[in-house]
């Protein structure tokens, strides 16, 4: 009885200004509030893969939230590895221009498993998942908003690799639908 959403649930937009116009502190964010309500209403675990939360100093956290069946917050995780790349065809990403990286690996003890939390680009850094496995994680989560170009080439391979390397299950909700820019 666990539900996971993708990375950047509710705020998948291009551009710093558009993002900053939409986001709210966690205690004022309607998505965060509703996720807690749904967890309690249906007595399930709800994992917001991540959403954008403003930080002091003008930066933003790419933060995952995990709520228990009572609606209480179990833990949060801030994405550690920023997606700063230049892809073919002029596509460029600089998450570090907007986001501040997290600084800690997170493993949550749940009744059905010890769960490690990660977000998207973190998938490319096996040492994070190894640290979680060594801390007892049996289930690794990687909600994502992988780009089509890198996702098609790497997504399935890397999720399988993290599972095999650590003898763990991987749950990895990915984005769907259309972006504002039509892709």
Where are these regions (language model features)?
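Active-site beta-strand/loop signature of hydrolases that rely on acidic residues for catalysis
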Residues: 1-22, 39, 46-47, 122, ...
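Short beta-strand-to-loop element that shapes/binds the nucleotide-sugar donor at the catalytic cleft/hinge
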Residues: 50-53
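An acidic, glycine-rich surface segment that forms the CoA-thioester-binding/catalytic face
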Residues: 27-44
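Short, intrinsically disordered, charge-balanced linker/junction segments flanking boundaries
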Residues: 1, 163, 179-183
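Histidine/acidic-residue-rich catalytic or RNA/ligand-binding cores of hydrolases
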Residues: 14, 153-154, 158, 180-183
